[in-house]
Amino acid sequence: TVPYMVPTVSFSEYLTDRLKVAVDAGVEAIHVEEPEFWDKSGYSEAFKREYEIYYKEPWKPQHESLDAQYKCARLKAYLYKRTIDRVSAALKEYAKVKYQKDLRFYVPTHSLLNYTQWKIMSPEAELISIPTVDGYIAQIWTGTSREANVYEGVYKERTFETAYLEYGVMQELVKGTGRRMWFLNDPIEDLPSYTWENYEYNYRRTAVASLLHPHIWHYEICPWPHRVFDGRYPRFQPRIAEKIETSFETDQS
């Protein structure tokens, strides 16, 4: 189990020190993936300290009032914004001073639409104000877009419609900024309990939805190929690797 960390100043310093090793090894870009808090979090001692520093008042549990809930959510966004700002600025300076290299810094993140559905707090709206962030990966796939929602009183999965809205929200992060956005295209999702026909059905819908936003033309295709090509998914189709050997390969030309 990987614990969720409160991004304190000391944590940002730890990340910076560890990532300098990657810069020394010659990496050209760093991705800080999914900076996020669960909405129900905010009760650790580290978070309480950050609350009292930020608001200059005693910590209040977020479940006690709407005001406390808002303050905790605002602080969660601030903490990750501060961390990304500090880490990216420090590493870019390190790469420039020591190696005369321009290091790039990207943030892979879900859409705010999905974060709302899954009750996750993200600093996404704040990322545009961090000058050392070079772009984003819109992490939208079947797992986020199949999340059921209500339309005209009917609650059901609407993968294509939801994906279209998610990609549309994400492109706003780079409009007029000169930054780059990649749209994620993943043939499967994290749950291995669906049939391959179901994965393919929904993959086609998310892929088409991503193509309907012409201002974005960079894509991350099949981010976890081992889940597609080594036969682990779905669990109850042991010969799936043979079945999909060429189904989702990209053209070689």
Q: What do the predicted segments below correspond to?
A:
Residues T1-V169:
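Polysaccharide-binding and catalytic clefts of secreted carbohydrate-active enzymes
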Residues K101-S253:
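Hydrophobic targeting/anchoring helices
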